[in-house]
Amino acid sequence: MGKENQQGYFGEFGGRYSPEILHDALVELETTYKKLKKNKHFKKELEYYRKNYIGRPSPLTYAERLSKVWGGAKIWLKREDLNHTGAHKINNTIGQVLIAKAMGKTRIIAETGAGQHGVATATVGAMFQMETVVYMGEEDLRRQELNAIRMRMLGAKVVGVSSGTATLKDATSEAMRDWALNVSNTHYIVGSSIGPHPFPTIVRDFQSVIGIESRKQFKKVNDKLPNAVIACVGGGSNAIGMFYGFIQDKKVKLFGVEAGGYSSDPGSHSATIQFGRTGFLHGTKTLVIQDDFGQIVPAHSVSAGLDYPGVGPEHAYFHKSGRVEYVNVDDEGALDAFIEVCRIEGIIPALETAHAFRYAKDLARTMSKKENILICLSGRGDKDVAEVSRLRKGEFI
């Protein structure tokens, strides 16, 4: 793994670049987390909620129909869509709310794009009876209305953010501001592998259950490892969790799929690894989509969860080291894959995951029937059906 040093760096990426007012809170979080990782009661409690609340381990499914129709390699799915709340996000929120409880916090906040992290945060807020506030861009509130309703039903206050592009970046900025103002009683449950140290490490550790389970399950069924592992990448939490299980297996190729949007022009995609440059965003040093003056360029994706102009610092490290290959799929390709997976396999995937499916289709056709591709099915697509229907004008063929 791209093991971070004491300052929270992965190679040249990472670190802690935050306002002075957050320094003590970040140090407290780091110190508490280090202690809890060694605490038997914490580990037992986390395992209890993973098994009895989230429903882990999530299944490994052989996608027989996709394998037959696409041709080439066999397709396997790690079913994070079957977790409680419908995505991988609950893996992280359940862990972080236990940290918040250990620190004596009474209020939790979060940012969300597609709304799945917001729902997962609202869920643990309800279960642990903590005041919960979720920041969400107005554009994302429009295209992910179902999840906004779910959050409110769970008791969370949903705050629309209209600044900037009114998407994930802006929601994250507002959540950071809230945390700075209410740091004494509030824990910020960062939803992706982004932010100042120790957030990228904490999120990766809680999501690593995906890859650890996947490796064990796949080997048990096939008596070998997959040839390729594919996951979508926005900030990158589902991908970093999936890759964790295979990062030391050099023969397993790892692919991160970003959002190619509708063109390669600035402002029309979220392909940070391909088009980004080293910079600073939300408290970390990473690859960022920016102009020649260092200003953040607006990102775009048909998928709200991938609509982010940065990427987790560990992904930036894996790109630079060459261990993971990062590619991108455009909006239309993702929409096509969304409908195709529905029709062929009877699974409605999240639009985020649809990017991974589209790339897997192309890759599978370059491989033999004896080879295997494992896809992280990061979430279900109930939240996306209205937006897909709108974009395709009700035509699904």
Curated annotation (Swiss-Prot):
Pathway: Amino-acid biosynthesis; L-tryptophan biosynthesis; L-tryptophan from chorismate: step 5/5. PROSITE patterns: TRP_SYNTHASE_BETA (PS00168). It catalyses: (1S,2R)-1-C-(indol-3-yl)glycerol 3-phosphate + L-serine = D-glyceraldehyde 3-phosphate + L-tryptophan + H2O. The modification N6-(pyridoxal phosphate)lysine is found at residue 89. InterPro entries: Trp_synth_b_CS (IPR006653), Trp_synth_beta (IPR006654), Trp_synth_beta/beta-like (IPR023026), TrpB-like_PALP (IPR001926), TrpB-like_PALP_sf (IPR036052). Keywords: Amino-acid biosynthesis, Aromatic amino acid biosynthesis, Lyase, Pyridoxal phosphate, Tryptophan biosynthesis. It comes from the Bacteria. GO terms for biological process: L-tryptophan biosynthetic process. It is an enzyme of class 4 (lyase). Its cofactor is pyridoxal 5'-phosphate. Its EC number is 4.2.1.20. Gene3D superfamilies: 3.40.50.1100. The beta subunit is responsible for the synthesis of L-tryptophan from indole and L-serine. Tetramer of two alpha and two beta chains. This is Tryptophan synthase beta chain.
